[in-house]
Amino acid sequence: MNTEATQEKSNVNSTGERLRTAREQMGLTQQNVAERLCLKLSTIRDIEEDNSPASLASTFLRGYIRSYARLVHVPEEELLPMMAKQAPVRDAKVEMMQSYSLGKQRKKRDGWLMIFTWLVLFVVLGLTGAWWWQNHKAAQDDLVSMGDQNASVEEDGRQSIALSDDNANGGAQTAIPLDNKPATANNAPSSVTATSDNGTPAATAQSSQVTASNAAPAANAVNDNTPPVAVAPSQAATNSSAAAPLPTGSAAVSRPAADANAMMMTFSRDCWLDVTDATGKKLFSGIQRSGGKLSLAGKAPYHLKIGAPAAVQIEYQGKPVDLGRFIRTNQVARLTVGAP
């Protein structure tokens, strides 16, 4: 008898039983309570059956019980001792936050990304520097080759001038002795006689023979006392050309027609220049002085190398050639003129 009373008392002292009894007295169903408290029907059943779901924190469970008690008009002080048994306060498991590890992984990943970015940047800078150095070295090599070619051209010019001076001095020292024999004077009239074609020139030739025979002793006397006269080769060539008869024909002097591929260059300053035509023939290579003009004609297109593009004005077929891009960069101009 005492056992049944104790069991009944324990049932009454149960939180879920007390709330269910109060609900039934008010004529409410579990569905009505769940709708009014905005809870799940399974949560109301767990409260009335004194179950403590593991997925539900004890703090929330105690709050649901208090809301249920207020709904069915059960004092909270009556339920507090029973709630301590049914829903004891449990220490919540605090899981280790992974923010530190995630931040560490993110930092590591960002570190690799920064290393890769810097590596790409260094590669780009290295390639840019190598490209600039190659262009600078090529320009320096061109300048050195221009200087060597200029030196060789000047050396060739000095050698040619020295050679021409030697030839002039050697020619001035050669002497041509005059023939002292009277045969020279006697032979002169015969050459004049050979040029006559009719009777009148023949008579003139005979008179010249008489004059020559009379003048022969005097000429011989003069020749005996006259020393040899030195005659330069240039003077001999001048005399021979002066003695040669000039043509007096009425034929007009022919002039070459203007070349359609002619190229004219005007120089405002000293400039090194190298020009070849389509056949590979070198039309010019050397230095042009300030104020000079150069006209070239060959087979187009022409391949030009200009040391100072700002010092040259080029006209091809009467049209100016644009050198602006080379002047702006201040580099040696390499261009092709007259390409189809």
Swiss-Prot record:
Topological domains, Cytoplasmic: 1-111
Low complexity composition-biased segments: 202-233
Membrane topology annotation: Single-pass type II membrane protein
DNA-binding region(s), chain positions: 30-49
Family matches, as CDD domains: HTH_XRE
Superkingdom of source: Bacteria
Protein's cellular compartments: Cell inner membrane
Ranges where the HTH cro/C1-type domain occurs: 19-79
GO molecular function, one term: DNA binding
Disulfide bonds: none
Transmembrane domains' residue ranges: 112-132
Domain comment quoted from the record: The helix-turn-helix (HTH) motif in the cytoplasmic domain of the N-terminus is involved in the formation of spirals to maintain the rigid rod shape. As this protein is anchored in the cytoplasmic membrane, the HTH motif may contribute to protein-protein interactions to form the RodZ helix, which is localized beneath the cytoplasmic membrane. The C-terminal domain may be critical for determination of the rod shape by probably interacting with enzymes required for synthesis of the peptidoglycan layer, including PBPs in the periplasm.
Family: Belongs to the RodZ family.
Protein name per the record: Cytoskeleton protein RodZ
